[in-house]
Amino acid sequence: MQVAIVKYNAGNVFSVINAVKRLGIEPLWTDDAEALAKADRVIFPGQGEASHAMSYLRQRGLDRVICDLKQPVLGICIGQQLMCKHSEEGDTDCLGIFPMEVKRFQPTRHEDKVPQMGWNSINVNGNGNGNVNGNGNGMFNENEDVPSSARLSTYGAQENEDSNSGIDLFKGVKEGDFVYFVHSYYVPLHEEYTIAMANFTLDYSAAIHKDNFYATQFHPEKSGMVGQKILENFLAIDN
């Protein structure tokens, strides 16, 4: 299997490369349109600023390339945000794969510090609270011990037997498992496209899915065995 990782001006790429290597696959880090189109799977990762990232993608024609991909594609962190229609960060028009508008967190409590940085549970029961007790804001720092369970559920999308269901991304992940977040902006909930949600000052999309496009706000490559399972699930999704 050929896994391509989109090469652009975003950080945190090498942790994704190493995570894929741990699964026994040597990924291709590339900005070549033909190589991306021919890959069996494409990962669109990164941390960065939306307007700078979109400017880079447009200058190299990668915006059109990504939108035209037919194989399973996984956006991570800013990759998820750039898949949306627009971002408040830099008042940026994005790829428009998903219709949502990316918003900045506006915390109302002193203890809610932006960016959200740490371990948080993803919630899929629709009960509106993915947080658990940790460092005072419902999360655990990267160097803290992470509890084994909280709440995990799917939001919006219906669980079914289809091999291309968004639920496939979470197969084998235990209810309430924790994942790692670092972000100041969020994708709002959407009844059709949100497949997992989290809570930090409000409920938002922790993962979204449309056709062959999957995306997570959290970092599976930094989320231990849970994140590894999610990456395994993505690589196993039928084309």
List where the protein language model places each region:
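Extreme N-terminal starter segment of soluble prokaryotic enzymes
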Residues: 1-4
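Structural motif
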Residues: 43-45
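Amide-donor transfer/coupling interface in amidating biosynthetic enzymes
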Residues: 68, 102-239
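Structural alpha-helical scaffold elements that stabilize or flank donor/cofactor-binding regions
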Residues: 35-36, 65
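An anion/phosphate-binding loop that grips the pyrophosphate of nucleotide cofactors and donors
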Residues: 39
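Cysteine-nucleophile active-site neighborhood
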Residues: 48-123, 232
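Generic structural signal for residues in well-ordered beta-strands
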Residues: 26-27, 102
